[in-house]
Amino acid sequence: NLDFIIVDMPPGTGDTQLTFAQEIKIDGAIIVSTPQELALQDVKRGIKMFDKLGVKIIGLIDNMSHFVGDDGKKYSIFGEGGVRKTAKEFNKEFLGEIPINPEIGKQGDLGSPIVESQPDHEISKIYLNFAEKIKSIYL
């Protein structure tokens, strides 16, 4: 049985997203964005498009929200709070943040998702938390 299928689409509201939403019954969309203003403009158009098409928006995720330097300080190099603010503006749930962490790319390059190879890693816990939130909506 297939409970969920997640489709990673290119940014924006172009033909890919529109055709997908019109041709396939979608139970919900999760919008993932970096916190830059230009990216958030696409997010706002995407929210309006999905709302118009009757596709439920499960929530928004802030990707590459920050990184923690060797000094232990948090650096928000792409801006801070934009995705959360956009979620609030459109009355959508803010699901959380994914910080920049080189381990994500490293494990991906090795063909081993971080949630499998390092289930106790902070990033794994973030991903699993998203999965639980999404699951709780549908199950």
Report each predicted region and the residues it spans:
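Short, hydrophobic alpha-helical segments
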Residues: 131-139
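C-terminal boundary of histidine-terminating zinc-finger modules
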Residues: 110-123
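Conserved catalytic-core segment of NTP-binding enzymes
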Residues: 3-107
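Short, intrinsically disordered/low-complexity patches at protein termini
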Residues: 39, 55, 119-120, 139
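Active-site phosphate-binding and catalytic loops of NTP-dependent enzymes
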Residues: 1-3, 139
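Alpha-helix boundary/capping detector
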Residues: 46, 112-113, 130
